[in-house]
Amino acid sequence: MFISRSPDETVALGERWGREAQSGWVIGLTGDLGAGKTQLVKGIARGLEVIARVHSPTFALLHEYNDGRLPLFHLDLYRVETRAEMVAAGLEEYFCRPNGVTVIEWAERWLDPVSSFESQVAGSRLRRVRLEVLSDTQRRITYEDSGP
């Protein structure tokens, strides 16, 4: 567990994760609007040495960044309501990209109610992250890793 006291601290945590990230990693982010999911992704991108400006792909659903140490696939499922919409948009192929790091905002929308997150990313390292708003400036960030 990590308590972030500012957006900069959230970015710094993400940067540490980005530095340790390896091909095939999947990071699923959950939390309310404004909890800091995109700030964490900005840090992950910085740790991966991504040069491009990172912002939430809420309307595009997906942003690919190929200018860093590893490709970063940043998905935002906020506007996606069903698995059929994910498939129609071609998003499922990005959930477990072996050649890069996939970060999924609103990952709970991807979860299949009858199967676990782990089975959907079999063979990948999965970090499940929950961001909670504690105050205007503080966030509780809890995470759990599974897989190789």
Model regions and ranges:
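The conserved Walker
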Residues: L33
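Phosphate-binding P-loop
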Residues: W17-G24
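Conserved lysine of the Walker
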Residues: K37
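Hydrophobic anchor at the beta1->P-loop junction of P-loop NTPases
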Residues: I27-L29
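N-terminal pre-Walker A segment at the start of P-loop NTPase domains
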Residues: M1-R16
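Short beta-strand-centered segment that lines the nucleotide-binding/catalytic pocket of NTP-utilizing
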Residues: V50-Y65
